[in-house]
Amino acid sequence: MARIAGVNIPDNKHAVISLTYIFGVGKTTAQKLCDATGVKPDAKVKDLSDEQLEALRTEVGKFTVEGDLRREVQMNIKRLKDLGCFRGLRHRHGLPVRGQRTKTNARTRKGPRKPIRK
């Protein structure tokens, strides 16, 4: 297994699909990475040369991925909570943030139903 950005990417899959195993790299970004490094998107990772893998590593290094991206997202949420703005309050209370209805749906965000006490 090749290791890029601290992630073991599968050898037996195409390069584009394997790159999406990295947090922060989707299909479009993976395609751009392959184009920038000259790697054929349909080439298997096990068939790539060491130079191509190294080129992919340096190109991925230019993006914010994995731990840095996770930390950045968490810091953004923490900033909203500290500001006390509406979105921060929704995060703090564990409710949907982007205006979804909560009367009937939002079970994932709200958690399991609580029984009615008498």
Curated annotation (Swiss-Prot):
Keywords linked to the UniProt accession: Ribonucleoprotein, Ribosomal protein, RNA-binding, rRNA-binding, tRNA-binding
Keyword Nucleotidyltransferase: no
Domain of life: Bacteria
GO cellular component labels: cytosol; small ribosomal subunit
Keyword Protein biosynthesis among record annotations: no
Molecular function terms from GO: rRNA binding; structural constituent of ribosome; tRNA binding
UniProt-listed InterPro entries: Rbsml_uS13_C, Ribosomal_uS13, Ribosomal_uS13-like_H2TH, Ribosomal_uS13_bac-type, Ribosomal_uS13_CS
Region (Disordered): 94-118
GO BP field: translation
Subunit (UniProt): Part of the 30S ribosomal subunit. Forms a loose heterodimer with protein S19. Forms two bridges to the 50S subunit in the 70S ribosome.
Family: Belongs to the universal ribosomal protein uS13 family.
Cited function: Located at the top of the head of the 30S subunit, it contacts several helices of the 16S rRNA. In the 70S ribosome it contacts the 23S rRNA (bridge B1a) and protein L5 of the 50S subunit (bridge B1b), connecting the 2 subunits; these bridges are implicated in subunit movement. Contacts the tRNAs in the A and P-sites.
Name under which the protein is recorded: Small ribosomal subunit protein uS13
